[in-house]
């Protein structure tokens, strides 16, 4: 297999192990309304999805306007940033891995369901923004993961064929999204087990032992 045309990264749970803090933020959001959110419900209904889709699920059966979605999103994400600010750090091995990709002249992009404020928050705390030639976020798509739209849009903006790209994901909807776009997928087990992510081409605990040659070997041997 030749070098990938691009390496496309999800953000939450893939480049930072922050899903425990998203869970805490959503639980605080729920508690304000006298409700309870379990970790199982988070993994099944929230992780990897856009805030618009999540808010519609949280308030299923209730009338929800775009203004409501924006207000609830701001509330929850402010909680998340307040909770996580003192703890944010990259997944082990991320920075050396980005350096490797850069040294091989592989374009690097981000395709995240997250909002711009959270992406800026990430870049402020983790100094990797110069590696990324493109960032596509959840406000730029109509259909969230597991729909392939965000990955096909990212490839289109990069000017590359999706089937020549490798995506890095941590969630089941994210893996499904990248696969549906025709990409090779490397899953990171920060949130889900290897068994839950078994549809991916390769599964890793973090980026610490990954090399470009090893990545190619992993995704070729499926």
Task: State where each predicted segment sits.
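Residue-level detector of anion-binding/catalytic polar loops
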Residues: 36, 107, 184
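Short, flexible loop segments at the rims of nucleotide/cofactor-binding pockets, characterized by
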Residues: 84-89, 113, 180-182
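Conserved catalytic-core motifs of eukaryotic protein kinase domains, centered on the activation segment
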Residues: 20, 112, 121
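Asp-based, Mg2+/Mn2+-dependent phosphohydrolase catalytic module
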Residues: 1-5, 95, 99-102, 115-222
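N-terminal helical cap/lid subdomain that shapes the substrate entry/recognition surface
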Residues: 2-95, 99-104, 129
């Amino acid at each position: 297999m030749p070098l990938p045309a691009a390496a496309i990264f999800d953000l939450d749970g893939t480049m930072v192990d922050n899903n425990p803090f998203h869970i805490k933020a959503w639980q605080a959001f729920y508690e304000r309304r006298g409700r309870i959110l379990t970790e199982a419900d988070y993994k099944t209904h929230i992780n990897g999805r856009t805030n618009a889709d999540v808010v519609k699920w949280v308030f299923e059966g209730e009338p929800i306007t775009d203004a409501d979605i924006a207000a609830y999103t701001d509330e929850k994400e402010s909680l998340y940033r307040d909770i996580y600010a003192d703890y944010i750090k990259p997944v082990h091995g991320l920075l050396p891995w980005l350096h490797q990709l850069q040294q091989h002249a592989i374009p690097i992009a981000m395709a995240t369901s997250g909002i711009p404020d959270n992406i800026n928050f990430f870049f402020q705390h983790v100094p990797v923004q110069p590696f990324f030639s493109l960032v596509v976020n959840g406000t730029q798509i109509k259909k969230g993961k597991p729909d392939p739209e965000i990955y096909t849009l990212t490839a289109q903006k990069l000017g590359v064929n999706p089937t020549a790209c490798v995506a890095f994901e941590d969630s089941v909807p994210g893996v499904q999204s990248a696969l549906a776009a025709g990409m090779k997928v490397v899953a990171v087990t920060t949130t889900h087990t290897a068994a839950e992510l078994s549809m991916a081409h390769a599964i890793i605990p973090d980026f610490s032992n990954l090399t470009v040659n090893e990545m190619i070997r992993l995704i070729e041997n499926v």
